């Protein structure tokens, strides 16, 4: 096996490993943010990232074993995954509306269920702590950092602004992660095609 093929083989193993780690990280990120997304999105994202992880591992195994069939299989499925992900990401960009932070906070406010939002997003009230004061209510402990009810630990930002910012950042993170995964999938696909051809040529030379 030539130096070029050896270099590509090593690069393929490394990049597939990186792709696998990215997919595993994406699964962890989805699990952490599952409560902020629709059930359909979470299930689809789990399936997609799990498939990416499986075929990244297959790519590593195929390169190590120098298997033409496994390398070609890995290449085909990585290309299919990349195409599907490009289509889904483009649809997401054009059709997905960022969730309304105002709606989320207003529902929690009406249900008197602000504590989890205030602690998670480090905010207080709908617009500020004044929302409680205007209603002659005590500012709840969840409005304070580490639940320490002192003025210097009070969260100053309102939850509508913080939750909306979280949703917008969440969408941006998803888009970035999605395009990074697509880039790695396409690179690993190209390397797998090169390796499949190289392994096939090696087999032919060994037959003579």
Swiss-Prot record:
CDD domains: tetraspanin_LEL. The keyword Nucleus does not apply. Transiently expressed on motor axons, growth cones and terminal arbors. SUPFAM superfamilies: Tetraspanin. Its main location: membrane. Coiled coil: none annotated. The chain crosses the membrane at residues 10-30, 41-61, 67-87, 174-194. Keywords: Membrane, Synapse, Transmembrane, Transmembrane helix. The keyword Transmembrane applies. One of its GO terms (cellular component) is membrane. It is a multi-pass membrane protein. It holds the Pfam family Tetraspanin. It comes from the Eukaryota. It is found in: Membrane; Synapse. GO terms for biological process: synapse assembly. Belongs to the tetraspanin (TM4SF) family. Facilitates synapse formation. This is Protein late bloomer. The gene is lbm.
């Amino acid at each position: 096996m030539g130096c070029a093929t050896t270099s590509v083989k090593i690069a393929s193993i490394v990049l597939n490993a990186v792709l696998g780690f990215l997919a595993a990280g994406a699964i962890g990120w989805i699990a952490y943010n599952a409560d902020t997304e629709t059930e359909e999105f979470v299930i689809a994202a789990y399936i997609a990232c799990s498939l990416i992880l499986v075929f990244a591992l297959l790519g590593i195994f195929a390169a190590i074993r120098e298997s033409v069939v496994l390398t070609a299989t890995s290449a085909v499925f990585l290309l299919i995954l990349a195409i599907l992900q490009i289509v889904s990401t483009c649809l997401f960009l054009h059709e997905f509306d960022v969730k309304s932070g105002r709606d989320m906070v207003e529902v929690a406010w009406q249900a008197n269920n602000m504590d989890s939002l205030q602690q998670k997003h480090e905010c207080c009230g709908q617009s500020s702590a004044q929302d409680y004061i205007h209603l002659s209510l005590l500012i709840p402990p969840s409005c304070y950092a580490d639940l320490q009810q002192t003025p210097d630990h009070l969260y100053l930002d309102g939850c509508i602004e913080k939750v909306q910012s979280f949703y917008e950042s969440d969408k941006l993170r998803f888009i970035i992660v999605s395009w990074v995964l697509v880039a790695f999938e396409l690179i690993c696909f190209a390397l797998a095609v090169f390796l499949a051809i190289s392994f096939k040529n090696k087999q032919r030379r060994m037959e003579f």
